[in-house]
């Protein structure tokens, strides 16, 4: 595998782990729902990044790709969106959604554990889900990433609109959010 790719995957893994620990610490200190959701999202991102690191260093395999795909494509963005929902709406809405998301996450993990693969993995070739999994894992990834990404984008736009409507010193923050929103779009 490419040394640069392996190095970047290692770096991303370590940065994600640090962010996961920082957000978990914030949740531990403040017990705010959005911190717990973001800690989960960053932990999933770290797991996916570590799987990528492992795969680029040693080669892709069935198990490594399942971990990478489950943590990164299926689960991560949904937990990130839950954090945005919790931040914008509060616990009355976020806590029931967290229970539902936990159940859906358990279902998705179960599907990914037992989903049959359609062809063997080539160790030094980045796998594509459509080449290895049937429809259900790919639908879970599409829904688990697409809908939450839309929620994150709409939440960011709603935050900008609220700041602009208030016309307070935070209005300057809204202009900064306008720059951050396209970055969130690319990241999701």
Q: Regions from the language model: what does each represent?
A:
Residues 19-27, 53-54, 60-61, 71-103:
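Internal transmembrane alpha-helix with an interfacial aromatic "cap," most often the third helix
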Residues 18-24, 79-86, 138-171:
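Alpha-helical transmembrane segments in multipass membrane proteins, preferentially the mid-helix core
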Residues 30-42, 95-101, 172-187:
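Membrane-interfacial loop-to-transmembrane alpha-helix junctions, especially the N-terminal start
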Residues 2-6, 26-29, 33, 60-67, ...:
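Juxtamembrane loop-transmembrane helix junctions in multi-pass integral membrane proteins
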Residues 11-22, 34-55, 75, 184-188:
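Hydrophobic alpha-helical transmembrane segments of multi-pass membrane proteins
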Residues 85-132:
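The cytoplasmic-loop to transmembrane-helix boundary for the fourth helix
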Residues 4-12, 114-158:
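Extracellular-loop-to-transmembrane junctions of the mid-late helices
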Residues 3-15, 66-75:
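Structural signature of hydrophobic alpha-helical transmembrane segments
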């Amino acid at each position: 595998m490419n040394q640069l790719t392996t190095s970047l995957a290692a770096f991303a893994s370590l940065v994600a782990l640090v962010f996961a620990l920082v957000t978990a610490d914030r949740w531990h200190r403040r017990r705010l729902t959005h911190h717990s959701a973001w800690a989960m999202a960053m932990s999933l991102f770290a797991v996916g990044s570590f799987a990528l690191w492992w795969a680029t260093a040693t080669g892709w395999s069935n198990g490594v790709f399942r971990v990478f795909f489950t943590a990164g494509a299926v689960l991560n963005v949904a937990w990130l969106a839950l954090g945005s929902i919790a931040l914008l709406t509060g616990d009355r809405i976020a806590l029931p959604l967290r229970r539902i998301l936990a159940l859906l996450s358990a279902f998705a993990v179960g599907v990914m554990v037992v989903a049959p693969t359609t062809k063997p993995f080539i160790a030094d070739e980045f796998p594509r889900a459509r080449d290895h999994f049937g429809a259900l894992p790919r639908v879970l990834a599409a829904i688990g990433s697409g809908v939450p990404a839309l929620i994150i984008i709409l939440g960011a736009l709603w935050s900008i609109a609220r700041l602009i409507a208030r016309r307070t010193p935070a209005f300057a923050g809204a202009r900064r959010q306008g720059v951050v929103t396209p970055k969130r779009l690319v990241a999701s």
